[in-house]
Amino acid sequence: MFVSVGITASLTTILAAPVLTWVWANHLEPNLLRVTRLNWNLPKKFAHLHGLRIVQISDLHLNHSTPDAFLKKVSRKISSLSPDILVFTGDFVCRAKVETPERLKHFLCSLHAPLGCFACLGNHDYATYVSRDIHGKINTISAMNSRPLKRAFTSVYQSLFASSRNEFADTLNPQIPNPHLVSILRNTPFQLLHNQSATLSDTINIVGLGDFFAKQFDPKKAFTDYNPTLPGIILSHNPDTIHHLQDYPGDVVFSGHSHGPQISLPWPKFANTITNKLSGLENPELARGLFSFPEESRLLYVNRGLGGWKRIRFCSPPEICLMRCLYEP
């Protein structure tokens, strides 16, 4: 009898585990918004930034499946953090489609920061969607090949078995920013910085770079108006670009793109290595979190993002990052 009960319990657990995991990953964790709190310990020359609060969001991927309740939750949480500067590091939409323009505008207009809201574009934010193809090359992805299920299998195959080197397809040309998205941004608090710099009241530089996959990453142009006597924040959607910025100024780089990745196994180590490859990065170790580059006196923060082409997450909840600037004599 006891053996029978034990077997029944074991079978129930075996059958229930995948169902519960599916429910968690599809319906619960995608709505578990988390705030990551970081401190930027300032050198004396940047002491004037003491107390400044910078909030970063990324990878909203707004589409018809994004719940209004989630957007309101994000907006309320950002407001509660009282940011002085708010930055958005790209991928406003999914696969170059502005599916719900009024919802996007309403959400962005609900966000405010006294020193300004700034944004760069991600690889989904151009007139044509650009990502890795089945061969691992960076290329435009047609509407047929960007269908969710097909794209998911392609991404998994490419991430695990194809090259992750940042190689462009021979036919890929620089892509233009999505005109519909750009038009919407003009009517929101966000200033789009596309290979441009802005200086805030002789306090800090904000640099926004074009997306690397879209062949619009142009740091030489972006830093033209950079004030080298002031600290700098750099917005670059793809964290792989950190190694292309070694010859340029700037103290903190904010990125996204990887989503964490959305399905992440933090342990054991080999499982974490495999799931990090799902980020599609050339440097998968940069899939999430804070990184320090002492030789350049630079920090990189890679945000897990808010959404995705599919709202599924496991051990990688959606994220808002708050960075506080602190100077201690």
Curated annotation (Swiss-Prot):
Co-factor note (free text) = Binds 2 divalent metal cations.
Q: Which UniProt keywords apply?
A: Cell inner membrane, Cell membrane, Hydrolase, Manganese, Membrane, Metal-binding, Transmembrane, Transmembrane helix
GO MF terms held by the record: metal ion binding; UDP-2,3-diacylglucosamine hydrolase activity
Where is this chain primarily localised? Answer: membrane
Q: Name one Pfam family in it.
A: Metallophos
Instruction: Identify which cofactors the protein needs according to its UniProt entry.
Output: Mn(2+)
According to UniProt, the reaction catalysed is: UDP-2,3-diacyl-alpha-D-glucosamine + H2O = 2,3-diacyl-alpha-D-glucosaminyl 1-phosphate + UMP + 2 H(+)
Q: In which pathway does it act?
A: Glycolipid biosynthesis; lipid IV(A) biosynthesis
Q: Which domain of life is it from?
A: Bacteria
| Membrane topology field | Single-pass membrane protein
Q: Where are the transmembrane segments?
A: 2-24
At the top of the EC hierarchy, this enzyme's class is hydrolase
Q: What is its EC number?
A: 3.6.1.-
Q: Where can this protein be found?
A: Cell inner membrane
Query: Which residues does the record give as a divalent metal cation 1 binding sites?
Result: D59, H61, D91, H259
Instruction: Tell me a GO biological process for this protein.
Output: lipid A biosynthetic process
Q: Which residues hold a divalent metal cation 2?
A: D91, N123, H257
Report one GO cellular component. plasma membrane
**Functional summary from the UniProt entry:** Hydrolyzes the pyrophosphate bond of UDP-2,3-diacylglucosamine to form 2,3-diacylglucosamine 1-phosphate (lipid X) and UMP by catalyzing the attack of water at the alpha-P atom. Involved in the biosynthesis of lipid A, a phosphorylated glycolipid that anchors the lipooligosaccharide (LOS) to the outer membrane of the cell. Can functionally complement lpxH deficiency in E.coli. Overexpression of LpxG results in toxic accumulation of lipid X and profoundly reduces the infectivity of C.trachomatis.
What family does this belong to?
Belongs to the metallophosphoesterase superfamily. LpxG family.
Q: What is this protein called?
A: UDP-2,3-diacylglucosamine pyrophosphatase LpxG
Species of provenance:
Chlamydia trachomatis serovar D (strain ATCC VR-885 / DSM 19411 / UW-3/Cx)
Gene name in the database record: lpxG
